[in-house]
Amino acid sequence: EIGVRLVGSEMCIRDRLYTMGKQEQTDICADVEKSLRKKFHKKIWCNFTKAINRYELVKEGDRIAVCISGGKDSFLMAKCFQELKRHNKFPFELKFIVMDPGYSPANRKVIEDNARMLNIPIQIFESDIFDSVYNVEKSPCYLCARMRRGHLYSYAKELGCNKIALGHHYDDVIETILMGMLYGAQMQTMMPKLHSTNFEGMELIRPLYMVREDDIKAWRDYNELHFIQCACKFTDTCTTCNNEETKSKRQEIKQLIATLKKTNPFVEGNIFKSVENVNIDTLIEYKQGGVRHSFLDTYDEKSGKTE
């Protein structure tokens, strides 16, 4: 089913491009950009710029590699960055990069066609990540993600960039928080920006940090856009991604949050804010800078103090 959907999307995009002239393609791009300024101004654009400003993701003189995977999130991020550059008060540069980890010809063409239709000047570079992780039995998705990031950092640095931008959104953040607690026995979050530990001077930023996934889907559907989903070899022959044997832990967390939301409409916001309201004085242990600390370290010093 997934393979069929991807091919269907490719055919849809190809047919649209073949049956329209350059002016019509320009009009589609203009409509997509207008939707960010009008219909989705509050839910997408304002939350995009809110994250940019709140977490200081973009600074004067930055050269940012906007990483496009081919999905809805990264293409939306690219359009938001183009809009930001048009209106921002200080100069910064953008490079739109696509890593081909071994896409099928159909999936690669979907990405190229979408980039052309949306007027995004992508630069594609090759890697063999899919082949490298195909025979890995334990955590191939985790290994693939780590290898992808390394290749993206490396290529971005070759282009003179000091930052890479990834398309993780608000829902990714709250799901990561719960996954860490329920499956990893740890309290942590997906950070809005990080310094690279392996590529000196490089940073990773997540500009869609405060944008909801449902709003991204609404933007996609409103503009009748078609993007690839997961295009790796592991899902090429998958007939369903919702059965009990194949669904991911992240999908389980999505369903858990949806269930909790039925009785508590604020549950998503509460999860998001929980990592902003951590009281270290109430933790048994915590790690900082790789060093583990215990409440016992300072317990006797607090003797006689008010609780």
List the model feature ranges, each with a label.
Residues 93-94, 172-256:
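Catalytic subdomain that performs nucleotidyl-dependent activation
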Residues 2, 90-92, 267:
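Residue-level signal for beta-strand positions within conserved beta-sheet cores that form or flank
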Residues 41, 45, 108, 149, ...:
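A structural signal for well-ordered alpha-helical scaffolds and beta->alpha junctions
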Residues 1-15:
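Single conserved hydrophobic/aromatic residue that forms the stacking wall/gate
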Residues 225-307:
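The feature marks non-catalytic terminal segments
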Residues 12, 141-144, 161, 232, ...:
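Disulfide-bonded cysteines in secreted/extracellular proteins and peptides
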Residues 146-159, 193-199, 254-274:
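Short, basic, helix/turn surface patches
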Residues 17-187, 191, 195, 214-222, ...:
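ATP-dependent adenylation/nucleotidyltransferase module used to activate substrates
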